[in-house]
């Protein structure tokens, strides 16, 4: 069994806040909701997140494509990205 000793009287080094680098934004369809956006805004303000990753950008609830040979609709996708950028987040694609 390995053991480690910690001297609590010794001063330590500042910890790098690696958690501020990125937050997972869950599924893209959730980011269309006002309550989700408010929670994300608070999280960015309080925690200082810089990057956001999420999944489901082309999921059915984003309505990018829903008919064979039909047009593409990026309105919801653009709405999400515009909101992320307004918060100072860099969305990862």
Question: What label would you give each PLM region?
Answer:
Residues 1-93:
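Non-catalytic accessory regions flanking glycosidase/transglycosidase catalytic cores in CAZymes
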């Amino acid at each position: 069994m390995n053991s480690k000793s910690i001297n609590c009287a010794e001063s330590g080094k500042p910890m790098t806040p690696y958690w501020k680098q990125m937050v997972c934004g869950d599924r893209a369809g959730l980011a269309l909701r006002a309550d989700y956006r408010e929670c994300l805004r608070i999280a960015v303000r309080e925690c200082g997140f810089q990057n956001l990753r999420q999944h489901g950008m082309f999921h059915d609830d984003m309505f990018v494509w829903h008919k064979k040979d039909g047009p593409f609709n990026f309105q919801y996708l653009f709405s999400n990205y515009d909101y992320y950028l307004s918060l100072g987040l860099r969305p990862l694609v």
